[in-house]
């Protein structure tokens, strides 16, 4: 029990952090070492041999990349650190967004041989969007090609960041011997391979000049963004160690700069100073502005991070745990929650029971009696709550801002192999859909096949893999299909009438709707401009719903419709015969006619592709991209490599990984994220529509 008691710390000693990085920068290894040095893990796990604690799903162990954000808690110098492990592969940026939503701070891990890589840019921009304060760790300082100054410079060039190195590496590659702490002006070395014996000593003579110069540079960089240090700097005063720490904390929390540490997680070098940095510079829940929420009337309210306020929490992740069933991860923003109590899911308007509360350490669990503001906890017992929902104590009503999930861009048809698989499939899919809002599933009415849509080939591969492993459902998988969309290109005004009279009560719905193109970055907007009660208010939501439902199937080839603004102008109703259903049908009839008359076109997803390659292969790679209808955006140098940035239709990118490997003898790699949708060229559209 001692261990659990120790987990309850004052709120100012709590750090909720994420570790974010590019796929191979060493994020999982860094997390592992943090758990090792904070005493929560006694044998060091390694991704290379598949024993890392955070990567607890079997697929992750095999692929060596982190997929699911597991939440882990550990202790360091009387502080408690909750770590949300974030994935580093571009197909999982949704997971990253979801975890950033509930973090207070983050450690950005970079590979010192490569600096900022494409996926790091994506993740960094997401962290900017959620205003997450960050410190940085230049990892792999012992690797051939490690170059600390170059790596820091890439943070300026590619991220527009304001990095402030607080350490200087002593040597690099195989000569990497330790770090110089530029604040205390001491050298730190590690004496044993486990990294547990750390010595702090005077800076070796050969490093003295470089350290003085680096410290001067650090003070200047702090002064640029901190008034207090700037004043001292201008007056020639030397700030004290405490003043530097305080300034770095202010700068980090305000998002004005990023303290940079360095080391090698794999070799156990530099982890303790990084932990000190997490505690010193990253915010506690008290350092951040209160979270915004909305009351019943839609007025904005602030949720204060205090134990005495009513309980409010946000569900940021659902996992189906092999041992305990459905686990709902909550970030508690205010108040206190005891196990066995009831809460209200305000998003859905349902009551939920909290059977057990669990602190997680990757796949180990500790039951606790209660949780408080600031905590991250796994809850057992919630039935209806899914990702993005708000839960509150009874008699309290708050809804926190919802997360927006991107539209899927790729689909596959799956077919159960046996009758037994068929019966298990829908339950298994429901579990996966609860966990992952970026996954969609529906049954194709014409073919009867189940269609899965997701963020990329890897995303869907892993879902199919999980169906097999976790739910024991074997499926046959069709070829990946592009998630095309349809839209209109001109304004149309349509009347939709649904009238049925056949003895007894009839049906009557009548609407006049103006449909217009809205721009392809938006899905749908509905405006009610009726006046004088021509259609009673209670039927308006049914009209919107009728259009929304009809938008699932377009007229060209049955693809979902996007980019539509529908303005309800007029209509009429019948005292007896009108019903929600009648108006819903009238609205969907109007929409179908609008699609036919509004010059419908087919849209395709255009992907932002970045290929990183040695110079020798660049010509062939560009030629190949051009043959895929690519629009080459930019060519850049990145160290000794070249980067090709291009916009390419997703339909041309299937199997690209294999082609790229053969074009570059396996030396080039690429990342791909959705950029936007655009009209399919006519010749290509003809082929698609012919099927």
UniProtKB/Swiss-Prot annotation:
Keyword Lipid biosynthesis (UniProt): no
GO cellular component: cytoplasm
One GO biological process term: ribosome disassembly
Domain tr-type G residue range list: 12-286
Keywords: Cytoplasm, Elongation factor, GTP-binding, Nucleotide-binding, Protein biosynthesis
Subcellular location(s) per record: Cytoplasm
Binding site for GTP: 21-28, 85-89, 139-142
One Gene Ontology molecular-function label: GTPase activity
SUPFAM superfamilies: EF-G C-terminal domain-like, P-loop containing nucleoside triphosphate hydrolases, Ribosomal protein S5 domain 2-like, Translation proteins
PROSITE patterns: G_TR_1, G_TR_2
UniProt main location, coarse: cytoplasm
The UniProt record lists the keyword ATP-binding: no
Family: Belongs to the TRAFAC class translation factor GTPase superfamily. Classic translation factor GTPase family. EF-G/EF-2 subfamily.
Described purpose of this protein according to its UniProt entry: Catalyzes the GTP-dependent ribosomal translocation step during translation elongation. During this step, the ribosome changes from the pre-translocational (PRE) to the post-translocational (POST) state as the newly formed A-site-bound peptidyl-tRNA and P-site-bound deacylated tRNA move to the P and E sites, respectively. Catalyzes the coordinated movement of the two tRNA molecules, the mRNA and conformational changes in the ribosome.
Designated name of the protein: Elongation factor G
């Amino acid at each position: 029990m001692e261990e659990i008691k120790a987990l309850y710390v004052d709120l100012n000693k709590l750090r909720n952090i994420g570790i974010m990085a590019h796929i191979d920068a060493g994020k999982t290894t860094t997390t592992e070492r943090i758990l090792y040095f904070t005493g929560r893990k006694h044998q060091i796990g390694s991704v290379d041999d598949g024993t890392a604690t955070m990567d607890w799903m079997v697929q992750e162990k095999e692929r060596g990349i982190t997929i699911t954000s597991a939440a882990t808690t550990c202790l360091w110098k009387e502080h408690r650190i909750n770590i949300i492990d974030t994935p580093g592969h571009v197909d999982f940026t949704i997971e990253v967004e979801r975890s950033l939503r509930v973090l207070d701070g983050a450690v950005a891990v970079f590979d010192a041989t490569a600096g900022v890589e494409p996926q790091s840019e994506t993740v960094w921009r997401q962290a900017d969007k959620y205003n997450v304060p960050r410190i940085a760790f230049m990892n792999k300082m012992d690797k051939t090609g490690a170059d600390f100054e170059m790596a820091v410079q890439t943070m300026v060039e590619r991220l527009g960041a304001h990095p402030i190195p607080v350490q200087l590496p002593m040597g690099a590659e195989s000569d990497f011997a330790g770090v110089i702490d530029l604040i205390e002006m001491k050298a730190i070395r590690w004496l044993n391979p486990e990294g547990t014996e750390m010595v702090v000593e005077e800076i070796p003579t050969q490093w003295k000049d470089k350290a003085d110069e680096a410290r001067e540079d650090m003070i200047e960089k702090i002064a640029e963004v901190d008034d207090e240090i700037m004043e001292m700097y201008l007056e020639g005063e030397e700030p004290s160690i405490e003043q530097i720490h305080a300034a770095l904390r202010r700068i980090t929390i305000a998002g004005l700069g990023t303290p940079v540490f360095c080391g090698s997680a794999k070799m156990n070098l530099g982890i303790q100073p990084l932990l000190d940095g997490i505690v010193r510079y990253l915010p506690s829940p008290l350092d951040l502005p209160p979270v915004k929420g909305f009351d019943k009337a839609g007025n904005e309210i602030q949720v204060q991070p205090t134990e005495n306020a009513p309980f409010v929490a946000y569900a940021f992740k659902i996992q189906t745990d092999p041992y305990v069933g459905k686990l709902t991860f909550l970030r508690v923003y205010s108040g206190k929650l005891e196990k066995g109590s009831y809460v209200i899911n305000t998003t859905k308007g349902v009551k939920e029971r909290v059977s057990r509360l669990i602190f997680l350490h990757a796949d180990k669990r500790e039951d606790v009696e209660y949780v408080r503001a600031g905590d991250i906890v796994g809850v057992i017992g919630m039935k209806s709550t899914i990702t993005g929902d708000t839960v509150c104590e009874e008699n309290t009503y708050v809804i926190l801002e919802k997360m927006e999930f991107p539209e899927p861009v790729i689909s596959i048809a799956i077919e159960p192999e046996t009758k037994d698989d068929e019966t298990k499939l829908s339950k298994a899919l429901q579990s996966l859909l609860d966990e992952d809002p970026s996954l969609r599933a529906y049954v194709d009415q014409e073919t009867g096949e189940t269609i899965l849509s997701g963020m990329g080939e890897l995303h869907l591969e892993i879902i199919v893999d999980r169906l097999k492993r976790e739910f024991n459902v074997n499926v046959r998988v069709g070829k990946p299909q592009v998630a095309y969309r349809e839209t209109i290109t001109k304004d149309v005004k349509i009347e939709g009438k649904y009238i049925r009279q056949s003895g007894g009560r009839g049906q009557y719905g009548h609407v006049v709707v103006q449909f217009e193109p809205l721009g392809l970055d938006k899905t749908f907007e509905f405006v009610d401009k009726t006046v004088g009660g021509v259609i009673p208010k209670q039927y308006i939501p049914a009209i919107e719903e009728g259009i929304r439902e009809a938008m699932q199937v377009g007229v060209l080839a049955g693809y979902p419709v996007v980019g539509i603004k529908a303005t309800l102008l007029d209509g009429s109703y019948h005292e007896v015969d009108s019903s929600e259903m009648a108006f819903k049908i009238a609205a969907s009839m109007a929409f179908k006619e609008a699609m036919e008359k509004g010059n419908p076109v087919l849209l395709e997803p255009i992907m932002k592709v970045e290929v990183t390659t040695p110079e020798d292969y660049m010509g062939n790679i560009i030629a190949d991209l051009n043959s895929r209808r690519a629009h080459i955006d930019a060519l850049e140098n990145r160290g000794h490599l070249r980067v090709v940035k291009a916009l390419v239709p997703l339909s041309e990118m299937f199997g690209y990984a294999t082609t790229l490997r053969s074009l570059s003898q396996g030396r080039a790699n690429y990342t791909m994220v959705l950029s936007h949708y655009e009209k399919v060229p006519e010749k290509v559209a003809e082929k698609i529509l012919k099927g």
